[in-house]
Amino acid sequence: MKIKTRFAPSPTGYLHVGGARTALYSWLFSRHLGGEFVLRIEDTDLGRSTQEAIDAIMDGMNWLNLDWDEGPYFQTKRFDRYNAVIDQMLDAGTAYRCYCSKERLEALREAQMANGEKPRYDGHCRDSQCTHGADEPSVVRFRNPQEGSVIFDDKIRGPIEFSNQELDDLIIRRTDGSPTYNFCVVIDDWDMEITHVIRGEDHINNTPRQINILKALGAPVPEYAHVSMILGDDGKKLSKRHGAVGVMQYRDDGYLPEALLNYLVRLGWSHGDQEIFSIEEMTQLFTLDAVSKSASAFNTEKLQWLNHHYINSLPPEQVAVHLSWHVEQLGIDTRNGPELVEIVKLLGERCKTLKEMAESCRYFYEEFDAFDVDAAKKHLRPIARQPLEAVKVKLAAITEWTTENVHNAIQGTADELGVGMGKVGMPLRVAVTGVGQSPGMDVTVHAIGQARTLARIDKALAFISEREAQQ
């Protein structure tokens, strides 16, 4: 049997982390078994579906490198197919027209709730012999079995059973002629030969209805697996209140796709005590029986830890490609300075995100307007004039600009002055970067370049002179 899974988001908002995890699990399951993965856009909610949301879904999937073998399919382009099946069901008697008014249905609902009953359709039109005009508004309902039960073996949760008496006759076509979500899903899974439906636990109650429709059509029933929800660190359902955002916001905030994928796969799935998984390892190891039934809590600190790991473990060239986007967003021109690969090597240990790295690398490429106030107050004092003048002479004398020669110049200055490296290095750091923290001075000065370094030392010496004049 060819394995075939699908990811079927509704384009009513961004691709959130819960949806991304579902997509990842479906993708991994199919890839692990050599199957196919389908992308389907369930846009039947015409009032809420937007092109912007569709674009956000596609951008998120592409950024995460979750490629698909078929699609994207759009439900709004398949209405003729859905309605043709509904007409066949009307002819076969597995569906019927319902002419109940909104007023009758509302009164029924209120009466049931007043009696402590679960609101459900009472089947008024199910076996009605009443005649109605051809133009009288009606919906079409599925004739759900009234006896027995629906049992399915959830691949994460085990056997789940629903009594058919608990399931009312579902509307499958509205009065305006449009098919409903629960029906479209069934026909899509049938037509697209989906073998395994992996989705959120909020769809469990839809499953028995969908299975009954499939059986009425004589269609194969796929396997189902319902993934538990993701909670915030306070134990409540993850929402915007917890900072839950679309997948692309994580890109904007400086996270690598490899880090987010690694984090998402571990939100419910495990393989021993292993924490770090490449996409190749995930594909090789992923199985549904290792997915937990329990809800998972989203922890931003853990994601940052993983991101820092991948910044420093992936090839610098690969990280630099992602970094370039962030640098461009800040308007930094990198043509006059070190390659971004060097920035990754220099700042990787210090930065948890690429956004932080981009914001920290500006002094490698641009002149700064002013020194950091606290750093200058502490390190650009009159006492710093001598070490800055001395190290400038040695740096200016270098004919081969290497990290080793820069280091020797700084160390040699400290030795000649009989002071510790910090007495030279800290004023030099503030002079050439404008701030009080940076990577080691030898690699930083080397990356900034000889001419720019000497000019910045002059700027710092002028600053010290101005400071002296004001005292």
UniProtKB/Swiss-Prot annotation:
Name of the protein: Glutamate--tRNA ligase
Function comment: Catalyzes the attachment of glutamate to tRNA(Glu) in a two-step reaction: glutamate is first activated by ATP to form Glu-AMP and then transferred to the acceptor end of tRNA(Glu).
Chain span(s) of sequence motif 'HIGH' region: 9-19
Keyword Iron-sulfur: no
Keywords attached to this entry: Aminoacyl-tRNA synthetase, ATP-binding, Cytoplasm, Ligase, Metal-binding, Nucleotide-binding, Protein biosynthesis, Zinc
EC number: 6.1.1.17
Record localization: Cytoplasm
Gene Ontology CC annotations of this record: cytosol
Signal peptide: none
Major site of localization recorded for this protein: cytoplasm
Lineage per the UniProt record: Bacteria, Pseudomonadati, Pseudomonadota, Gammaproteobacteria, Enterobacterales
Gene field: gltX
